A protein has these predicted regions:
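Transmembrane beta-barrel domains of Gram-negative outer membranes and organellar outer membranes
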Residues: 2-105
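Short loop/turn motifs that connect adjacent beta-strands in outer-membrane beta-barrel proteins
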Residues: 21-29, 62-74, 152-156, 186-205, ...
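Transmembrane beta-barrel strands of outer-membrane/channel proteins
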Residues: 35-39, 76-80, 115-119, 160-164, ...
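Solvent-exposed loop/turn segments connecting transmembrane beta-strands
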Residues: 45-52, 88-90, 166-175, 212-223, ...
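Outer-membrane beta-barrel architecture
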Residues: 57-59, 103, 146-150, 181-185, ...
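Outer-membrane pore/translocation modules
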Residues: 70-184, 248, 257-260
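Alpha-helical membrane segments in multi-pass integral membrane proteins
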Residues: 174-185, 197-212, 223-225
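Outer-membrane beta-barrel "beta-signal"
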Residues: 225, 259-272
Length: 272
């Protein structure tokens, strides 16, 4: 039900293999497995860096009740997002964000929604701190309630929603966040390169844009654009994507949330 409709009947099950709410393609904080490289420019002090990012995570369904693709699901989400300074001799770890929470998703026809309560904590790398004596650390952690409403129409998808910090450190952080975006999926076709060797291998062009705006950052719009090719097999929910990426806005990771950056790069993404 992530990528195509099903005519199946009513059923309930534990540990479903997919979700009634499709994961957001262009959200930088979507729990997933990926590795990427970005040429990053700090817009405040005009410095440049080659940044490597890796992520591990997924939404794991505990229980679902469905009629075809319609229904609801509850599960567990967990994610790790780490950034590395590739210009340093040891490719030092800059920052890691840890996310864990409970998502509740629902679908009826073209409409779907995801509501989740999750915790995030951020931690700077040891080598990063050792090389910068006196660095002003911020112990950033929070719990947020988030809701996203999505609508699918043929090859397009629109979504919008937001979040509210129910608890946060520092306690002075403003609480409200808005989020919206769109996704486009082109026609799926046989893979022209590997399709002759691997029967059933398909490719789909994809494009997504995610926008976020935070009360804490005076509602400045942060933009993330991804586009590329997705590989899949008939009958499988697993996806392999090679995506180009452009980001403009405040840093989406860790205690650097007040740093204005611009980045361009590419990455490999696995949807399990």
């Amino acid at each position: 039900c992530r990528y195509e409709q099903s005519a199946g009947g009513s059923r309930q099950s534990a540990f479903p293999k997919d979700d009634v709410f499709r994961p957001l393609l262009a959200d930088p904080k979507q729990p997933q497995f990926f590795a990427s490289w970005q040429a990053t420019r700090a817009r405040t002090d005009r410095t440049y860096a080659n940044v490597g990012s890796v992520g591990f995570g997924e939404n794991f369904g505990f229980y679902t009740r469905r009629d075809g693709c319609n229904g609801w699901q509850v599960g567990l989400l967990a994610g790790v997002f780490s950034q590395f300074n590739l210009d340093a001799p040891s490719s030092e770890l800059i920052n890691t964000d840890y996310i864990v929470g409970i998502p509740l998703s629902w679908r009826s026809g073209a409409w779907s929604t995801r509501v989740r309560l999750y915790h995030q904590s951020s931690h700077l790398g040891d080598e990063f701190l050792l090389g910068r004596p006196g660095f002003n650390r911020v112990n950033l952690s929070f719990e947020e309630v988030e809701a996203i409403l999505s609508y699918d129409y043929r090859w397009a998808r629109l979504y919008a929603g937001g979040g509210y910090l129910v608890d946060r450190e520092p306690a002075t952080l403003d609480r409200i966040r808005a989020q919206w975006g769109f996704e486009l999926r082109g026609p799926t076709m046989d893979s022209p390169i590997l399709g002759t060797m691997l029967a059933g291998l398909r490719i789909t062009p994809v494009l997504g844009t995610d926008f976020k705006s935070f009360e804490e950052l005076n509602w400045v719009i942060n933009t993330n654009v991804v586009g590329g090719i997705e590989w899949s097999m008939d009958g499988s929910t697993r996806r392999l994507r090679v995506l180009l990426n452009y980001y403009h806005g405040f840093n989406p990771y860790g205690q650097f949330f007040a740093q204005k950056i611009e980045a361009v790069g590419f990455g490999l993404y696995l949807a399990l």
